[in-house]
Swiss-Prot record:
GO molecular function: ATP binding; protein-exporting ATPase activity
Protein's membrane topology: Peripheral membrane protein
Localisation per UniProt entry: Plastid, Chloroplast stroma; Plastid, Chloroplast thylakoid membrane
Organism name: Diacronema lutheri
Family statement: Belongs to the SecA family.
Lineage: Eukaryota, Haptista, Haptophyta, Pavlovales, Pavlovaceae
Record-listed E.C. numbers: 7.4.2.8
Biological role stated in the UniProt entry: Has a central role in coupling the hydrolysis of ATP to the transfer of proteins across the thylakoid membrane.
Sequence positions that bind ATP: 83, 101-105, 489
Location (main, coarse): plastid
Reactions this protein catalyses: ATP + H2O + cellular proteinSide 1 = ADP + phosphate + cellular proteinSide 2
Protein name: Protein translocase subunit SecA
Keywords: ATP-binding, Chloroplast, Membrane, Nucleotide-binding, Plastid, Protein transport, Thylakoid, Translocase, Translocation, Transport
Family matches, as SMART domains: SecA_DEAD, SecA_PP_bind
Database matches in SUPFAM superfamilies: Helical scaffold and wing domains of SecA (SSF81886), P-loop containing nucleoside triphosphate hydrolases (SSF52540), Pre-protein crosslinking domain of SecA (SSF81767)
Amino acid sequence: MLKDILRKTTQSDLYRYENIVKKINDLERVMKPLTNEELRAKTLGFRKSIEDGQSIDNILPEAFGLVREASLRILGLRHYDVQLIGGCILHDSKIAEMKTGEGKTLVAILPAYLNALSGKSVHIVTVNEYLAKRDSLSVGRVLSFLGLSVGLILADMNREERQENYKCDVIYTTNSELGFDYLRDNLVGNPSEKVQNGFEFAIIDEVDSVLIDEARTPLIISRSLETLNNIYLTAKNVAQAFEINTHYEIDKRNRNVYLNESGSKLAEKLLGVSSIYKFETGTYILNAIKAKEFYTKDKDYLVMRNQITIVDEFTGRILKGRRWGDGLHQAIEAKEGVTVGSETMTMASITYQNFFLFYKKLSGMTGTALTEAKEFKKIYNLSVDCVPINKKVNRIDKEDVVYKSLYAKWKAVLYESLSIHEQGRPLLIGTSNVKNSEIVSGLLKEYNIKHSLLNAKPENAANESEIIAQAGRKGSVTIATNMAGRGTDILLGGNPDFLTKGELRYIFRSIVLSLDDMTVPKNELINNLKYKYVISEKNRLDVEELIDKLKSAYTVPEKNRIGVEELIENIDESFQPVDKFEILIQKLYEKTKERYVRECLAEKEEVIQLGGLHIIGTEKHDSRRIDNQLRGRAGRQGDPGSSKFFLSFEDRLIEIFTTGGLKNMIKELDLEDDQPVEGKIVSLSIESAQKRIEDKNYQVRKQLFNYDNVLNLQRKVIYDERDRFLSLTDFKGLILQYLEKLVDDVVAEMERSENQEDKSRGIVLFCKKFICLPYSIDPELLSNLSKEEIKIFLNDQVKISYELKEIELESLRVGLSQSLEYAFLLQSIDQVWKEQLTRMELLKESIGWRAYGQRDPLLEYQKEAYRIFAIQTRKIRHSASHLIMCSTSFA
């Protein structure tokens, strides 16, 4: 049903988009004769039209046509009709599903240009910094050529650099930088320290990775707390003494641990305590067991430089700076014997689900979105449209084969690899984690098969783009962990641009090394280069000239070295050299690339004849999307290719999630260990298991979204109030308002006491201790006053006291009262919000128990959250009032 609805919706929209594309194509003859200056002038004309009230939808055909022409002139790349359709989908605030190799990067600049014309910034969001930097320096030049400013936000930028880049028309950055900048902006002490300028339109590349896969992991800014590290080591020792099913049970599906009575008694005996729960030791022990049972080195994390580094299960990359919460990270540190880090207190947090909903307009691109169409619509109100492919997919996806044991599976993977390699076909082997990638690498080494290994380990990840770019060469073998967000196409025959830049870098670095020893003959260097790269005689003179030039020009080697490395990274046919040295580099680039283009085209034809790129999958992922991303690397742009998955009944997904019927069938067949099972029944059973996991994960994300929505409403109230503090120039009115509400709260609290004397004494104590009145009040004065009279009396006293406070502070230094009030207001709201985040986390963890009382946990959470928040907002007023009134003594 859902597929039919999606198909009909996509089809009706497709007719509309095709009509727009026809208009764009008709305008091409108008754009062609225009000079570069005339093309740029169009941008000013569009902006004027928008200022005069014209809708950007009306100028879409002409704007897209302009970008297409500029792209052809600057990059030598002309948008296909299907790419124009992709641009229309993005402009309509939808998700464009585009297959691998269909040019998503080029598509994004179409709606980015159009929407930036209105003067509001467009954020193009990528999953890693390499892609953000690459795209801003490549396709970003088209936008710059047309007169738009292009910004780039990277992790190592300071505040001033961020502020400058966020002012640009189009900004390339990562999802994590956007989220953390938002959180940091809401912790600043001065509005001038903020870096972001609002959320207008975001185009998210690999949108499924950001909005689906990372939805469960909140962005958190925290500060360290003092930690008793020995408690984690003690818990680890206790966990090691336990045996599974004797002292505890585990739930593999949900990664939960249950300590039974035997385990509790043993723990209490080992620790010498009466109850592990009474002393909160139970939580530490449960985490230690989770670390032992569910978290595996080189799969879930790496040990690097005495630290635990998390590996992203979806992309295979390390997550720098991320830590598991609730003491789990410390438990894993204790397990691995590295330094146990401090526990942290959350200062600010947000999920991507709620962060990206800030944008007035949101869209995204990916090769795999339809499987999650329901979630995109439900959570983000984003429809998914499939972009027609430019050329028919020519890939053969073979049936999955399943072996009884892991040993038999790896043996089959090896034999398949040897067979494909003997044919000369390029081979890409996908693995689910670092550990498995190294198993395959070890097997290939045994047979002396040269290969490239790409996983989360820094020594392997450093040359990621080059490894992927050359994975389509004849006879190449590449092992890679999950392929999501790799961002580089695999071109059959090799990528001439990467090969050219690789050769230039090698030449340059070799020359730099030779500068330390000026006696190294040029011929020896040239011969070394010939060994590494095929340096033609045509290039020989250029290389010799470059050696002489470098040896004479190096006055500040380190600075020049960095500059030349960046020059090589960014150079292309449209590069404009500014001196003789750059002219030489440009000349060398053009000649070298010309050679590689010829070689790669010739090699591509050979690889096509052999059958193209072959994909081997070594395990099915929980999500079908990740499997499809791996498959999608073969068969791009009409090229031939094939894929095949090799599985085992000992694989996690099959072992835990497939039905008993499949396992019983295998037992009845009584197969040999190396005899595989294949066919529709097996594939359907595995796919059914994946669908169940996907649905379960969707329910988890949906629940997280529902719970985080409650916190998000509170976050909005707090951040709006904080922004109000930042924008005020005079705090007197606000402080008096806070003091009046404080009096109301105190009087209401005292009214609960039935004893008049207790009421009077309580109010006097409040005046003395909480608001630090500089004089005493006689309780007898209050004994005969009504509630309203007490309020009037106290408000008068508080106001007089506040006025005296201001006079005293101003006498010490002009402006001191304003400075202190500003600081105390921010201190109060920040401290209370930190406490609230901790309270809400504890509430979320405990609220599930209410289900046993036949109550809806979410509804209970909403009620309790509202009650706690009401108390905390009062606490902001009380805390700020107390700090301001008691900042110095009147004595």
